[in-house]
Structure formats: structure tokens, C-alpha cells
Amino acid sequence: MRRRSALIATGVTLALVTGGATTSAFASTPASEAVTAAAVADTTPAIVAATNAFLATLTAAQKTAVQFAWTNTTQKKKWSNLPQGLYTRSGLMWGNLTTAQKNAWLAVMQVTLSPAGYTRVRQEWAADDQLASGGGLQYGQQYYWIALIGTPSATTPWQWQWGGHHVTVNATISGTEVALYPSFIGAQPASYTSSGATVKPLGDIWTSAYALLSSLTTAQKAQAVRGSTYIDLLYGPGQDSRAPSYEGIAGSALTAAQKTQLLTLISGYANLVNTEDAAGRLAEIQATLDQTYFAWYGPQTSAGNSYFRVTGPRVIIEYSPQAMGGTAANHIHGIYRDPQNDYGAAITG
């Protein structure tokens, strides 16, 4: 049964420091439960209400800075994983907002994302506070930006955009549909301590990917493993028009149990969005699972310094370790796309 937790979109007071009570953002939804459908309330009115509540906290100058026309295709695609100092973003910077304004924006994120997705994003965001600014580069939660493209509406399309170093969420809302693609899902450091607990924002995703690799036979690994060292992202910022690269092992070559494991891996991304939209999202992916490929570059160990990619008609996922700044396994770049629905192409007409 699909469930939607009750969430009040306004009047929410949220802590501005991510807690570290869990070691990873969430346990992925089992594939056997992920695509069961039932009637649930439309999420869009709550997202619109929360966004309008956020706008009501802003000054006239701030509203002008944060709002862009729906026809502004440049702003829709203006995002990067680079830190402040290497990339110029537009909108409102988090560090310049009041506490009331911050809490109002967090309510927008919380109603758009699932509880688990919100936790993952907050953990990735908080990781940036572990990095030291210097050399003209600035790191930390204060250097994340908010932009609104179009007018918040329950009927006509619009987009909210939030991001900074290693994390970007592009949320396109059109009627009852919410699309979170493309989004940059990374972390540096990939493991850190908060309130005495170890936090691994992407730990469950790595575990799911390695479990899938480990389940493959020698013959299957010959198809899936494409190289002995990790590679960089193919579908990162600025690669919106790049055609999908289908390589690795196809879903059609997997056993039923392995297909379940592949769906479990994918659910770590598909479940970023609220429960209502996540169920439909997983159904789309499951319908084309036989044409969805899993590829691996790097050591076949659990060390975390390997790249993997999931590529299908409805999903592109990349996980790419980076050597810059220390151990590759502790610096992750990641992407989540839908080749048919990036920036809501399939739902905005």
C-alpha cells in the first residue's frame, strides 16, 4: 500500500543543522513493494502552498532576485556541482536568508521530497560544512542557492531549483506530476561525524550497487565490468543533450533476484521524491527494466572507489569517485536523470 505521511506545509520549524543519528539516508524500498499503486492525495497543492508561504517571507528585492520567467530556459539549466568561486549561481543565497525564511524554504523541500529523500539531501548538504574554504573557493551550507522558474501553480508548470557544491535538486511541477531530473547527488566527504555518529549520505546506494555486482556470475561480470579504474561522469552538468550510453549487462540478462536488486539500487534515487510521485516513477522504470543496463568501472571490491552507471529508457544514474581532495571513495559525484523527462519535458508539454 502506498502511504503518504501527513505534512503541514506551513508553520514548520525545522532544525538548521543535520543530525547524524543514522549512518545513511535510508534503506531503499524493497522492489516488491516499490510499485504497488493506490489512490493518494495530490501533493502539488501542498508544494504550491509551501512555496507561496516562503515567498511571503521575502522582501520585494528578494522576490525579484529569486523569481524567473518560465520561458527562461537558461536559468532552468543553470546549475553545477562546482563550489562558490568557480561557478556563479543566480537567485537567493542561503547564508543571506533569515531564520524564518530558511525554515519556510525547508518546508518546500520537505513537502516535495520524501522523508528519506529530504534526509539524504540534508546530509549531503551538511557534508559541505566539513570542507575548509580557501584559495578563493567557499564551502559550507551558506553557499547554496534557491531559484523559482515560473509561478507556483497547481495547474501550470513551474520549477524550483536548489543547489550548490555537490548537491542540486531541480524539481519541475506540472499539475499532479513532480519530476526531480536532472539532480546532482554527490557528497564530500562521503563519510563524516555529526553529533558523535557516523553519517554516510550515499552509504546505502553504494551497498546496493556492490550487492548487485556481487550477485553476478563470472559470465555476467564479463558483460557488466567495463574497466579496472573509475571514470568521471558522462551525464553531469552541461550534458543535457548527451544520448544515453547503453553498456554493461542488460536487465534482460539478470535473474529475478538480480532484477530485484537492480530495482533496489534504483529506488535509492527514485524515492527521493514524495511517496505519491515515487510509486509512479518506479513503475515507469520497472516497465523498461529489461532494457536497462548496469555498468561497473573499477575494483570489484567493497572499498567504494569504483564507478557504476545505470542506463535505461527512463533512467540514468551515475556514481563517480573523485581523487581530488583525498581518498576517491570519500569524494563522490553523482547524477540522476530521466532521458525522456529531464526538466519535466514529458509532463510540461
Regions found by a protein language model. Name each.
Residues 23-349:
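A cross-kingdom marker for long, charged
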Residues 1-28:
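Secretory targeting and sorting signals
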